Swiss-Prot record:
Gene Ontology CC: large ribosomal subunit
Source organism phylogeny: Bacteria, Bacillati, Mycoplasmatota, Mollicutes, Acholeplasmatales
Complexes and interactors: Part of the 50S ribosomal subunit.
One GO term (biological process): regulation of translation
Function noted in UniProt: Binds directly to 23S rRNA. The L1 stalk is quite mobile in the ribosome, and is involved in E site tRNA release. Protein L1 is also a translational repressor protein, it controls the translation of the L11 operon by binding to its mRNA.
Name of protein: Large ribosomal subunit protein uL1
Amino acid sequence: MKRGKKYLTSLRIFDVKKTYPLQEAISLAKQTQVAKFDATVECAFHLNLDLKKVDQNLRGALVLPHGTGKVLKVAVLAKGEQAKQAQEAQADYVGDQDLIDKIAKNWFDFDVLVATPEMMPQLSKLGRLLGPKGLMPNPKTGTVTNDVLQAVKEIKNGKIEYRLDKSGNIHTILGKVSFDEAKLLENLKTLYLQLMAVKPRTVKGTYIKSVTISTTMAPGIKIDPVTISQ
């Protein structure tokens, strides 16, 4: 793959073969910004997990202490009092069957979809549309709930979802390059603590194989996992 000049220049800032302490890795990531805009800072945890084992197929959500810097559009499927709560929480779209019908016609002007359990039977028919886009509500991520007020507030305050991919990686957003280093550090440590808290008992050997941090379109910087827990 042909790389741009900025990408190649960023490679001179650090050693791709070296593993860096957390604080230094974050500092280097901010220096390697390739994009002209306020780039997203991303993190990937490579875990020693087997997707074939049900208890090792990690999926969940957490609220980052300093958010992600990204404003998400939230759609809520609810009726009555719960619909009012969604509006109170400043959800971008609130509806029931009317919203489901709209989605069925390929409307996806939202980033997260929240639904009450009552709405799931109707919504489940759209699994083929929502599933591939990662938009299907799920109890594990808190997007199927009766407490829509809390759900919307958490999403607006920087809640992220994480899910193990086929290669054993969990890839998430940590924030923006404009965040100061302390905020990015705390966000990453929060994610680390969450992954440690949900570590399956059946894991054998080293749980976290590697951790990498990068900004949009920039090369990844390896982090020493031991320094994250310090």
